[in-house]
Amino acid sequence: MRTAIFTGTFNPFTIGHADIVSRALAIFDHVVIGIGYNPAKTEHSDVETRIEQIEAVYKDEPRVTVEAYDDMAADFAARHNAVAVVKGVRTVQDYEYERNQAEYNRLLGDGLETVLFFARPQLAAVSSSAVRTLQHFGKDVSRFLP
């Protein structure tokens, strides 16, 4: 079985994230969504809520699992025997950041590959931070959430 991990904070998990998972499932047999967090900075209940929300999206998709992790992505990948990290890229800045992360993952993960999915044009403006900002101002964000 070819497993990939998809890591992020997913605060919140958006339709852009869901699109990446869908596209990854076309290539991999299993996708583990890893919610990265720093226990010193993030309440565990916040992470548990995100896990529950994402699991609800994939309740009928047995090829997707969701869990939290608080160490290196390469270590998280190794625990799941993952062959790749999948990431979404919306901007040139995203690409530069993910390219550097890919190098670290390859070095630390014994050849762990990174597969980049470029955001579909209609989803390129969707980001968790933008959704949080809209929520802060009381706007309806349902169209940005799966």
Q: What does each model-found stretch correspond to?
A:
Residues 1-146:
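Nucleotidyltransferase catalytic core that binds NTPs
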